[in-house]
A protein has these predicted regions:
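Exposed alpha-helical structural elements
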Residues: 4, 15, 19-22, 76, ...
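Charged, low-hydrophobicity low-complexity segments
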Residues: 12, 16, 74-126
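Polyanionic, low-complexity intrinsically disordered segments
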Residues: 1-65, 74, 83-86, 107, ...
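Long, low-complexity, intrinsically disordered polar/charged segments
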Residues: 34-43, 102-104, 109, 325-330, ...
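Poly-acidic low-complexity segments
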Residues: 13-19, 52, 56, 98-103, ...
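Short, flexible helix-loop junctions that flank or precede catalytic/ligand sites
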Residues: 113-130, 134-503
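Beta-strand-loop-alpha "switch" segments that mediate conformational coupling across diverse proteins
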Residues: 69-71
Length: 503
């Protein structure tokens, strides 16, 4: 068996060496392809199959350099992967003395892998590492009769990345996660929630863990909260989130009011907190005192006092908000209004001269009113405090690298009431992993309350009447805003149907 790089690559372009920094071990294992680098930084992928154009484009995009392809034997690729095992280290059980919530911060990097680490630990490490490389928001480990299926949520859409063909390994994966999150590994009949941290290339990343019993064992969902992701992407502004000119102007106007409440609503993962961060970053001048309470603090804002919720120690949203109001704030951000007590305090704060920002889980801007009514709050106080509600969704953007003009069928145009537009559709390439989409942007509807709308809501008018009044004032629905994005070529009719409701 030939196991030397020189046996597979041109000697005149050498000497060759394996590079697990530019093409990490986790990716090499997943695709069964290693990166060899020769003289003059010449790069070649050694793989056990014929050239995969999509994978090659993806690697070239990652490295921002041309990459060649060379097929090698399965035995040789396995040998090269084994040689790279020492270049992938993860998850050392060392408590981080600097953490403020008394959990464990572990290390995950592409420098070395402990030789003593079990195969299950290495599998979990590789899965987490891959998720970070793919900028996934969630990792799903779903138990099956044969083992487990591992899926990532990338740009809001699920994709299968691994199959575990062993029920025992699947069980050990979940047990390992429980240990990391300091949960009860013996409890398999009840749901459990926890969190853990990893330090990756010098930055700290939070993970929320949810364990749920299922027919074939326990399923795990890991939410990834990368505080440094926004900083790496550039300045945090409303402009960077993809809002239209009118939406940005309206949000900025509401954010500069002297008092009241601005709420952002939408499902989990719709960018609510990011929108609030961008809003605070824009209005922060140093002249006002801004305090936030969050679960967790996802992004650190310079000059803003940020408090992490710690329910184990009794620091809840409601208790933290009460304390914040004694610290003479001008503007307050509450990460989420989850219960009646927090809602009541937020409303009172808005009525007593503070500008309050928060998020609420609701399907649209109008449903927020129903949520507060369901909590038992005085509706007159709610509408008196409330300045505006922003409901938003994230739609995937058509990949700029493979987008082509597209003519929808007549039935689609008729159904959406569209005559023409600049319709584009991605064909799929290495930049977008074959999906036709790359990146996301926000679409939103903004309900701005005036005296007329407040009177209708306080009088408990039918929702249809309230919606008609808002539309008469120029409000555009989520569906209308998403349709406008389709007609501009930013996204597709499929995304429109996926993220908005045809009301």
């Amino acid at each position: 068996m030939t196991t030397s790089l020189a046996d597979w690559l041109p000697a005149e372009q050498g000497p060759w060496h394996l590079d697990f920094e530019q093409w990490p071990q986790a990716q090499a294992q997943r695709w069964r392809a290693v990166l060899a680098v020769g003289a003059d930084d010449r790069r070649v992928l050694l793989a056990e199959r014929d050239e995969d154009a999509m994978l090659l484009q993806s690697v070239e995009s990652r490295l921002n350099a041309p990459v060649g392809w060379q097929r090698a034997s399965t035995e040789a690729v396995t040998h090269f992967l084994g040689a790279g095992e020492a270049d992938f280290r993860a998850l050392s059980d060392v408590e981080d003395a600097l953490t403020t919530i008394e959990d464990h911060t572990e290390e995950l990097s592409a420098l070395a892998l402990s030789e003593q680490a079990s195969p299950v630990v290495r599998l979990l490490n590789a899965t987490i590492y891959d998720a970070l490389q793919d900028t996934a928001s969630d990792i799903h480990i779903e138990c099956t009769a044969r083992g487990a299926m591992i899926r990532f949520r990338v740009d809001g859409v699920m994709a299968v990345v691994r199959q575990v063909e062993s029920p025992q390994v699947a069980e050990q994966l979940v047990s390992r996660l429980k240990v990391m999150a300091e949960l009860d590994i013996g409890e398999r009949r009840l749901p459990q929630d926890g969190r853990f941290k990893l330090r990756v290339q010098g930055r700290e990343i939070d993970f929320r863990l949810s364990i749920m019993p299922s027919v074939f064992g326990e399923d795990a969902v890991i939410r990834i909260l990368d505080r440094a992701a926004i900083a790496r992407a550039g300045a945090l502004t409303l402009d960077s989130l993809g809002f239209g000119d009118d939406e940005r102007a309206a949000i900025r106007h509401q954010a500069r009011q002297p008092h009241g409440m601005l709420l952002v609503t939408g499902p989990t993962g719709s960018g609510k907190t990011t929108t609030l961060y961008a809003t605070l970053a824009e209005i922060h001048t140093g002249a006002d005192k801004i305090i936030t309470i969050e679960d967790p603090v996802e992004y650190q804002l310079s000059g803003v006092v940020q408090i992490p919720v710690n329910e184990k120690k009794g620091l809840t949203f409601s208790r933290g908000l009460r304390s914040i109001l004694r610290h003479d704030p001008d503007r307050v951000m509450v990460g989420e209004i989850r219960d009646a007590e927090t809602a009541q305090i937020a409303v009172q704060a808005a009525l007593t001269g503070h500008l309050v920002f928060s998020t609420v889980h609701a399907n649209n801007a109008f449903d927020v009113i129903g949520r507060f009514m369901h909590m038992g709050l005085d509706l007159y106080n709610v509408v008196s405090a409330l300045n505006a509600v922003l409901a938003q969704r994230l739609v995937r953007l058509t990949c700029k690298h493979c987008a082509r003009p597209f003519t929808p069928d007549a039935a689609t145009l008729t159904r959406h009431g569209v005559i023409n537009g600049n319709f584009l559709k991605g064909e799929g390439c290495g930049h977008c992993r074959g999906t036709g989409y790359k990146g996301r942007r926000a679409v939103a509807e903004l309900l701005k309350l005036d005296d007329g709308l407040r009177d209708l809501i306080a009088a408990r008018a039918p929702m249809s009447e309230i919606k008609a009044a808002a539309k008469a004032r120029g409000m555009k629905s989520l569906r209308e805003m998403a349709l406008a994005a389709v007609c501009r070529g930013d996204t597709t009719f499929e995304e429109l149907e996926r993220v908005t409701l045809d009301e």
